[in-house]
UniProtKB/Swiss-Prot annotation:
A GO biological process held by the record: translation
NCBIfam families: rpsL_bact (TIGR00981)
HAMAP family xrefs: Ribosomal_uS12_B
Function of the protein: With S4 and S5 plays an important role in translational accuracy.
Superkingdom, taxonomy of origin: Bacteria
Family: Belongs to the universal ribosomal protein uS12 family.
Source organism (scientific name): Ralstonia nicotianae (strain ATCC BAA-1114 / GMI1000) (Ralstonia solanacearum)
Assembly information from the UniProt record: Part of the 30S ribosomal subunit. Contacts proteins S8 and S17. May interact with IF1 in the 30S initiation complex.
GO CC annotation terms, alphabetical: small ribosomal subunit
GO MF annotations in UniProt: rRNA binding; structural constituent of ribosome; tRNA binding
The protein, known as: Small ribosomal subunit protein uS12
InterPro entries: NA-bd_OB-fold, Ribosomal_uS12, Ribosomal_uS12_bac
Modified residues (3-methylthioaspartic acid): D89
Length: 125
């Protein structure tokens, strides 16, 4: 327990919060260009080929971001929008690419949770 005098000389300093998505620099989303589109495998108990892309952002950061949904039309030099949100079983992947925005199309024939995958409302039969 410090004395009052010690606190007057050197006050308590609150710990600074560290961002979980530093490349966004407090913005909700950021635009970037794909430098590499590839698949990678998840951590131990899971098994799959997860689609990811290395993206060079407008602020100069280069990040790995996840492409959600079934199928995509991304290739090198595609312009994409990224948002925060990590993928728990892919180390180093701390961002998601927004579906249905800029060069990335929405998921085809998606019926539920459409807004998360940039899919338009299907025509009523």
């Amino acid at each position: 327990m410090p004395t009052i005098n010690q606190l007057v000389r050197k006050p308590r300093v609150s710990e600074k919060l560290k961002s979980k998505s530093p490349a966004l620099e407090n913005c909700p989303q950021r635009r970037g260009v794909c430098t590499r589109v590839y698949t990678t495998t998840p951590k131990k108990p899971n098994s799959a080929l997860r689609k990811v892309a290395k993206v060079r952002l407008t602020n100069g950061f280069e990040v790995i971001s996840y492409i959600g949904g079934e199928g995509h039309n991304l290739q090198e030099h595609s312009v994409v929008l990224i948002r925060g949100g990590r993928v728990k079983d892919l180390p180093g992947v701390r961002y998601h690419i927004v579906r249905g925005s800029l060069d990335l199309q929405g998921v085809k024939d998606r019926k539920q949770a459409r807004s998360k995958y940039g899919a338009k409302r299907p025509k009523a039969a």
